[in-house]
């Protein structure tokens, strides 16, 4: 689940997301204004080695490194659904996104100048 969709797990704060306070968090559907519901991803496939909790955290302040990595086991693509209900299969462009599964949990995947990470950041939250 998108780490910015906190769903009331934390106290509602004027400071934004628990993870990145300068970005919006979303506790209910009426909180979704930017990006729009059709551009805010809700759930996706996460890379098996990256799974460490119920959220996929996107490092919106570092466009050169994944915190948690989306999956790429659908022929080099990953599935996303969005707040408005539609879903997309995103074909990954960068080798740094298509990481071989090692069955060993870790986080922090280098992705210098990644077009894939830029795509996910743009659809994860918005600057407050």
Residue ranges and their predicted role:
Residues 1-128:
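Short, well-structured segments within or immediately adjacent to enzyme catalytic domains
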């Amino acid at each position: 689940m998108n780490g910015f969709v906190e769903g009331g797990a934390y106290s509602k704060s004027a400071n934004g997301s628990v993870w990145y306070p300068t970005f919006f968090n979303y506790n209910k559907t009426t909180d979704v204004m930017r990006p729009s519901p059709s551009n805010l991803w809700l759930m996706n496939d996460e890379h098996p080695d990256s799974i460490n909790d119920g959220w996929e955290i996107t490092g919106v302040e570092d466009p050169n490194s994944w915190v948690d990595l989306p999956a790429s086991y659908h022929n080099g693509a990953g599935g996303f659904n969005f707040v408005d209900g539609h879903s997309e299969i995103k074909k990954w462009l960068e080798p740094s996104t298509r990481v071989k599964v090692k069955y060993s949990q870790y986080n922090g995947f280098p992705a210098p100048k990644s077009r894939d990470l830029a795509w996910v950041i743009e659809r994860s939250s918005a600057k407050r």
